[in-house]
């Protein structure tokens, strides 16, 4: 009830119709390393600061009544980083689940993971499994973590699955359409059909998508902010949501 009241106050304050709020917001959390360099601390300390920023954005998204929040936590390309940094990132994930899962569950948040989890450390897999099983029946904010995720890999995986069904006779070649491809993406049937993102935010001043939700982002609105991720505040997030609500989305129609 408190979250509903806060969302109402937000809409009244910004003269925003609830129907104009994004249903699904995706975030490319960029800038942890540069934040660490700027503050003369380790890259792992930067990732920890980024984790703290993420916690606050989750809370604000829930308060504003956003139904889906997806964060780009670890890409398939991030394995190129040092073993120490990669291990530290997954260690932070385990720490985050251990410290925050109880509160997430109490707030009716449902956790989902998008990506190939076979390669990640066992301790991280165990933490993820616990988060999924604990929050699986919740129906509040859907918090999706893109982990060992790459959109090209995701699309190729969907293509292999569809080809396998055609070869086995389960479906005809002419049945492969946009809906069929979408069904076999990580955002498809296996995760309850997460809707395409209405808004994608990238921090740190970089203006690119970086292999993130390429299929799903066909008609997404894009916002790029100069703030390094650990500096990205709930108030800035809220302002971006307000700015989005003033946009006129055309979906290629005119």
Residue spans of the language-model regions?
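Flexible, compositionally biased loop and terminal segments
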Residues: 2-254
């Amino acid at each position: 009830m408190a979250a509903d009241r806060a969302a109402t106050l937000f809409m009244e304050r910004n003269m925003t119709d609830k129907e104009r709020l994004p249903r699904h917001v995706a975030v490319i959390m960029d800038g942890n390393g540069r934040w660490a360099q700027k503050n003369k601390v380790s890259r792992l300390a930067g990732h920890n600061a980024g984790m703290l920023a993420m916690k606050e954005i989750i809370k604000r998204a829930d308060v504003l009544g956003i139904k889906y929040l997806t964060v780009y936590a670890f890409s398939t390309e991030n394995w190129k980083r040092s073993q120490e940094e990669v291990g530290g990132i997954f260690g932070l994930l385990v720490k985050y689940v251990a410290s925050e899962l109880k509160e997430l569950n109490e707030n009716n948040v449902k956790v989902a993971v998008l990506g190939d989890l076979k390669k990640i450390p066992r301790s991280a897999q165990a933490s993820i499994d616990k988060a999924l099983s604990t929050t699986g029946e919740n129906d509040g904010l859907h918090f999706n973590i893109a982990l060992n995720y790459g959109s090209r890999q995701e699309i190729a995986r969907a293509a292999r699955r569809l080809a396998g069904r055609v070869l086995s006779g389960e479906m005809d070649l002419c049945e492969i359409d946009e809906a069929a491809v979408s069904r076999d993406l990580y955002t498809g049937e296996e995760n309850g059909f997460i809707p395409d993102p209405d808004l994608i935010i990238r921090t740190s001043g970089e203006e690119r998508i970086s292999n993130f939700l390429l299929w799903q982002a066909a008609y997404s609105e894009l916002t790029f902010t100069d703030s390094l991720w650990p500096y990205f505040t709930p108030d800035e997030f809220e302002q971006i949501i307000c700015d989005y609500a003033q946009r006129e989305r055309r979906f290629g129609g005119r």
